Curated annotation (Swiss-Prot):
This is 2,3-bisphosphoglycerate-independent phosphoglycerate mutase. It comes from Flavobacterium psychrophilum (strain ATCC 49511 / DSM 21280 / CIP 103535 / JIP02/86). Pfam families: iPGM_N (PF06415), Metalloenzyme (PF01676). Mn(2+) 2 binds at residues 11, 61, 440-441. The gene is gpmI. Mn(2+) 1 binds at residues 399, 403, 458.
Length: 505
């Protein structure tokens, strides 16, 4: 075969066992529904060991796109770090040992900051517990936790239980909770520096609502309809109303998020550069991150560096002299480029990139179509030119609107995607492209929890794969790692040996 291929990723578009709670099943999406009737389809697993995550763990976009491009199961930091915590080998990691040594010799406090969540998407509470144990065993007396509440990868009101568990865990240890803030502020990834500033001012200047009881403060927030993701800065204080701890020059900071994208902006403000407009000045810190947030950072120590993934689909296409396009809106642009290329930033030879800005709205339920129409308009002329041999396209709507937990908005998102899919596939068929329609993980097919509350998290449901081709009549079930071998099979290119997964044709 020598086909041109479009990989169309409907982000967050899973297969629900219960149509009642599914935005997809409740949406009017005649074109996507017709694809199942007219073309071969099967399903893919995107969770747990199928994508190199711990068993039972829901997939996410970063992991999903990495497996898609790699053509193999990529064992994720989460699985690696979990093992280190279980086997109590975390304290043997060089970067961590050296940070503890520095704190001890210079009598400096250690500030652990990160997402306090069992979601396992950006972080995991077990990793924080492992780090706290390691610090205590090292004999460190001044350890502080700056917790970012989740409510997005887990339920919107789960922070109270998570903080209660943390308080029990650190009772009778030297560790103390120093501050609390929602991830909406501390973990922005869209250059909304005014959000990061709230987190910076809390951590560095102790600016926040004073509290001696974080659980009480959070339940007050709930009464004002502010859920975990949006918790406003809370500074924990002692009996004299002084902050328990703020981050000072020469302190040790350990950022325990293992996923890289949402740790970058706060790290930049604390350690890399001054933001004069926001009055944020970098501090001279002993700064450690659990994984490598950015190769270009100066003076940031990394506990777990990434294994380089080579011979990804992009690289194989480059070697075969093929032209490829990666296209997405801002929210998923790193996924179709950096993650799909196995953690490589620069484009391959013959790779062009099309980025459309995601709309500047507070939350995407306010504009559920996001930038899907703009992406479609930009892509159609490229399909008509037929110069590209491979196109990787991501529609973000199912995931990003799914995260809001608002069913009516998610239905609108699905309907917008349906219109765009119709335009792209119509053009693809007219110009002899084969389109593989898949998702990277589930989300908008489960908008409501069994107890009736909104579900904002990803799911472990399987996702569809539809093979839109004029001749081929079968496609098999598989995992995300099978997609690159399938694409190479369609294009008539031999897959490299390191691509250990299989074509689904």
């Amino acid at each position: 075969m020598n086909k041109k291929v479009i990989l169309m990723i409907l982000d967050g578009w899973g297969k629900s066992p219960d149509p009642k709670v599914s935005a997809i099943d409740n949406a009017n999406i005649p074109f996507i529904n017709s694809l199942y009737k007219n073309y071969p389809s099967a399903q893919l697993r995107t969770d747990g060991l199928n994508v190199g995550l711990p068993e039972g763990q829901m997939g996410n976009s970063e992991v999903g796109h990495m497996n898609l491009g790699a053509g193999r199961i990529v064992y994720q930091d989460l699985a690696k770090i979990n093992l280190a915590v279980q086997n109590k080998t975390l304290s043997q990691e060089k970067a961590l040992k050296e940070a503890f040594q520095y704190a001890k010799e210079n009598n400096k406090p250690i500030h652990f900051l990160g997402l306090l969540s069992d979601g396992g998407v950006h972080s995991h509470t077990s990793h924080l517990r492992g780090l706290l144990d390691a610090a205590q065993n090292f004999g460190l007396k001044k350890t502080f936790i700056h917790a970012f509440t989740d409510g997005r990868d887990v339920d919107p009101k789960s922070a109270i239980a998570t903080i209660e568990n943390l308080n029990k865990y650190i009772h009778n240890t030297p560790a103390k909770l120093a501050s609390v803030i929602g991830r909406y502020y501390a973990m922005d990834r869209d250059k909304r520096w005014e959000r990061i500033k709230l987190a910076y001012d809390l951590l560095v200047n102790g600016k926040g609502k004073p509290s001696q009881d974080a659980v009480l403060s959070i339940s007050n927030s709930y009464q004002n309809n502010i859920t975990d993701e949006f918790i406003e800065p809370i500074i924990m204080t002692d009996d004299n109303n002084n902050p328990i701890a703020t981050i000072q020059e020469d302190d040790v900071v350990i950022f325990f998020n293992f996923r890289t994208d949402r740790g970058r902006e706060l790290t930049e403000a604390l350690s890399q550069q001054d933001f004069h407009e926001q009055n944020m000045h970098k501090l001279n810190l002993y700064y450690v991150t659990l994984t490598n947030y950015d190769e270009t950072y100066k003076n940031v120590k990394v506990i777990y560096n990434k294994d380089n993934i080579t011979q990804t689909l992009g690289e194989v296409l480059e070697k075969a002299g093929k032209k490829q396009i990666r296209i997405a809106e801002t929210e998923k642009y790193p996924h179709v480029t950096f993650f799909f290329s196995g953690g490589r930033e620069q484009p391959f030879l013959g790779e062009s990139r099309i980025l459309k800005n995601s709309p500047k709205v507070a939350t995407y339920d306010l504009q559920p179509e996001m930038s899907a129409y703009e992406l479609t308009e930009a892509l159609i002329p490229e399909i008509e030119k037929t110069e590209a041999d491979f196109i990787c396209l991501n529609f973000a709507n199912g995931d990003m609107v799914g995260h809001t937990g608002i069913m009516s908005a998610a239905i609108k998102a699905c309907q917008a995607v349906n219109k765009c899919v119709e335009k792209v596939i119509t053009a693809a068929l007219a110009h002899n492209y084969t389109t593989i329609v898949i998702a990277d993980h589930g989300n908008c097919e489960t908008m409501i929890n069994p107890d009736g509350t909104p579900n904002t998290a990803h799911t472990t449901n399987p996702v569809p794969i539809i093979l839109v081709d004029k001749e081929l009549k079968t496609i098999h079930d598989g995992v995300l790692g099978d997609i690159a071998p399938t694409i190479l099979d369609l294009m008539g290119i031999k897959k490299p040996e390191v691509m250990t997964r299989n074509s689904l044709l």
